[in-house]
């Protein structure tokens, strides 16, 4: 049976997963504390993948039960169809989860060969940053005589995360160092971020000395964040000074306070769109009316400076839409806006069987009543690859894939740059074209 990760009511005062935020923006902790944590099907799926990986790694660590060696539970495929979280309506292990969790397990197990492995280990870094109740859970810790490894499984497939200077894992590593320092003489700490669904494994090595230098910086940042949280708790959010907030792409992108609650972030986004200061106390339309024209006038250097902020600007707009909708749905007033009935959904048959009978009675042909379509290559792969590999090999030879369309990536991306002629693959963004599209 799969072991369930115990859900504890206890929470860290400064969540390590948000360290990239509160270290840069000390006021963010106070703002986020006023908002509830929201779960999602994606988060539940990630929890299920973690629970599955934990169960198998621990089973491999201790293969005996009642003095006898187990003959099951070591292979991810044995868990197909199970529910790792052991609760109704939770994610079920499917072929995709098996493939990606297996990738993570194989990597960790190979790296842990001959070394000490700890799975889902709580690490406390309270003493490091000077804030009580500061802890997190490392997915895997591997210990050898002179090296400490911290492994983090991220099951999502949204944004690639780099292990280099990753604040969350560095805090985990500092907590683990504090735990093992008296026994081991570590020289190097190696951080790993596993994102199997993105085919991404990021690894970064840092010296113990450099890691401890980061710990001093983290201590200073943590003290500032706690000071702002205490001030807000005693005197309200309005008491927080402007200097408590430091908006930016990294710290704002997944902040719960984005989209209207955080004035500093709203100011930052509008200033980026305008290219100048925007007075949020005045009507915005006149101030932003020339924003589309501004895009056509940007130099390549200015575009390079603005482009990394696009995701943040888009996420701000989405979060603001959601906040307004949530307010109106809960009966709050948003000046100038109201809820109305939207466009009706697509027409569907209320009773498909009766509709089928009537269509047949109308003397329609089979091909007129039904749509027949061959299954897709991924569907065929699931049905045949395991049980009929030779048949699947013949089908696989028939598969075609269109070339990927050009996408924008930072220069650090390992993929080779495409040499192309100007504007042959992207939309026309000349001023005349933008004017035409706006009419």
UniProtKB/Swiss-Prot annotation:
It comes from the Viruses. Pfam families: DUF2800. This is Putative protein p51.
């Amino acid at each position: 049976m799969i072991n369930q990760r115990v859900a504890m009511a206890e929470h860290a005062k400064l969540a390590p997963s948000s360290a990239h935020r509160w270290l840069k923006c000390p006021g963010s902790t106070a703002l986020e504390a006023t908002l509830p944590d929201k779960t999602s099907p994606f988060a539940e799926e990630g929890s299920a993948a973690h629970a599955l990986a934990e169960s198998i790694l621990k089973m491999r660590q201790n293969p005996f039960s009642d003095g006898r060696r187990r003959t099951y539970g070591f292979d991810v495929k044995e868990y197909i169809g199970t529910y790792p979280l052991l609760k109704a309506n939770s994610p079920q292990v499917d072929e995709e989860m098996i493939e990606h969790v297996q990738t993570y397990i194989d990597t960790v197990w190979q790296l842990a060969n001959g070394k000490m492995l700890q799975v889902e280990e709580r690490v406390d870094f309270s003493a490091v940053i000077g804030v009580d109740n500061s802890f997190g859970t490392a997915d895997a810790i591997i210990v050898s005589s002179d090296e400490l490894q911290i492994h983090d499984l991220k099951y999502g497939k949204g944004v690639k995360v780099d292990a280099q200077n990753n604040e969350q894992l560095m805090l985990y590593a500092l907590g683990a160092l504090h735990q093992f320092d008296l026994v081991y003489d570590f020289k190097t700490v190696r951080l790993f971020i596993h994102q199997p669904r993105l085919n991404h494994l990021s690894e970064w090595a840092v010296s113990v000395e450099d890691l401890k230098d980061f710990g001093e910086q983290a201590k200073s940042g943590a003290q500032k964040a706690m000071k702002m949280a205490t001030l807000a708790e005693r005197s309200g959010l309005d008491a927080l000074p402007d200097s408590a907030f430091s908006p930016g792409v990294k710290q704002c992108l997944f902040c719960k306070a984005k989209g209207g609650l955080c004035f500093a972030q709203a100011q930052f986004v509008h200033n980026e769109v305008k290219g100048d200061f925007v007075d949020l106390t005045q009507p915005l339309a006149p101030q932003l009316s020339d924003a589309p024209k501004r895009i056509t006038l940007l130099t390549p250097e200015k575009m390079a400076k603005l482009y990394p902020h696009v995701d943040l600007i888009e996420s701000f707009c989405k979060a603001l839409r959601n906040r307004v909708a949530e307010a109106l749905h809960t009966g709050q007033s948003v000046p100038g806006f109201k809820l109305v009935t939207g466009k009706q959904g697509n027409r569907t048959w209320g009773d498909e069987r009766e509709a089928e009978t009537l269509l047949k009675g109308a003397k329609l042909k089979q091909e007129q009543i039904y749509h027949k379509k061959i299954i897709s290559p991924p569907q065929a792969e699931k049905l045949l690859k395991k049980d009929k590999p030779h048949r699947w090999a013949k089908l696989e030879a028939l598969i075609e894939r269109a070339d990927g369309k050009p996408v924008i990536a930072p220069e650090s991306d390992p993929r080779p740059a495409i040499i192309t002629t100007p504007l042959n693959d992207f939309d026309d963004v000349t001023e005349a074209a933008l004017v035409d599209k706006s009419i």
